[in-house]
UniProtKB/Swiss-Prot annotation:
The name this protein goes by in its record: ATP synthase subunit b 1
Keyword annotations of the record: ATP synthesis, Cell inner membrane, Cell membrane, CF(0), Hydrogen ion transport, Ion transport, Membrane, Transmembrane, Transmembrane helix, Transport
UniProt xrefs under Pfam families: ATP-synt_B
Organism: Mesorhizobium japonicum (strain LMG 29417 / CECT 9101 / MAFF 303099) (Mesorhizobium loti (strain MAFF 303099))
Transmembrane segments: 40-60
Keyword Isomerase: no
Family affiliation: Belongs to the ATPase B chain family.
Main location: membrane
InterPro entries, per the entry: ATP_synth_b/b'su_bac/chlpt, ATP_synthase_B_chain
Residues covered by region (Disordered): 13-32
Subunit and partners: F-type ATPases have 2 components, F(1) - the catalytic core - and F(0) - the membrane proton channel. F(1) has five subunits: alpha(3), beta(3), gamma(1), delta(1), epsilon(1). F(0) has three main subunits: a(1), b(2) and c(10-14). The alpha and beta chains form an alternating ring which encloses part of the gamma chain. F(1) is attached to F(0) by a central stalk formed by the gamma and epsilon chains, while a peripheral stalk is formed by the delta and b chains.
Gene: atpF1
Localization (cell): Cell inner membrane
Biological function: F(1)F(0) ATP synthase produces ATP from ADP in the presence of a proton or sodium gradient. F-type ATPases consist of two structural domains, F(1) containing the extramembraneous catalytic core and F(0) containing the membrane proton channel, linked together by a central stalk and a peripheral stalk. During catalysis, ATP synthesis in the catalytic domain of F(1) is coupled via a rotary mechanism of the central stalk subunits to proton translocation. Component of the F(0) channel, it forms part of the peripheral stalk, linking F(1) to F(0).
Length: 193
């Protein structure tokens, strides 16, 4: 509020009837002890303290503590249910891990047996193919040896005639005359033996 100079000049009405405190306006003779500290009021204060404490105790006992106890019981029940569920889930997880490990071991065993079977099958196929190839090579080798022996036999047959022709040419060149075929054949046969 805005104070004007005219309002500020007004003076408070004077109190008639005795001395007053300057700040409170309370008469000086009313100056006594603070009522809660007055020994004359202790019995009533103690009575009200007991009544208030009793009511507060009854309130706590009948209202607050049952609610708090109920909340604690609910929490304990929830915790025990959670622990039971956790142990159940842990058991299920352990069972799942055991089943997984068993299936993994079986899969490894199956993979090993499948690998062994595949290796055995490949080895058998390779052995069969090797035997077929060896048989084919033996057959070709036999045919080649037969051809070589026939070529050799033919060559040996012709060697005699070639030797006779060569001997005839040598005799003609050295002696200057011709020898008979029968003489040359007899000479080649005697040397070939």
């Amino acid at each position: 509020m805005f104070v004007t100079s005219a309002f500020a000049e007004e003076t408070a009405p004077a109190v008639t009837g005795g001395d007053t405190h300057s700040g409170t306006g309370v008469p000086a003779e009313a100056h006594g002890t603070f009522p809660p500290f007055d020994p004359a009021t202790f019995p009533s204060q103690l009575l009200w303290l007991a009544i208030t404490f009793g009511l507060f105790y009854l309130f706590l006992k009948k209202v607050a503590m049952p609610r708090i106890g109920g909340i604690i019981d609910v929490r304990n029940d929830r915790i025990s249910q959670d622990l039971d569920q956790a142990s159940k889930l842990k058991g299920e997880a352990d069972a799942a891990v055991a089943a997984y490990e068993q299936e993994l071991a079986e899969a490894k065993k199956n993979a090993s047996s499948i690998g062994q079977q595949a290796a055995d099958a490949a080895k058998a196929e390779a052995e069969t193919a090797r035997k077929k190839i060896e048989a084919a090579l033996d057959e070709k080798l036999g045919e080649a040896e037969a051809r070589i022996s026939s070529i050799k036999a033919n060559a040996m047959k012709e060697v005699g005639s070639i030797a006779e022709d060569t001997a005839s040419a040598i005799v003609e060149a050295l002696v200057g005359g011709k020898a008979s075929k029968a003489e040359i054949a007899a000479a080649v046969k005697s040397v070939a033996r």
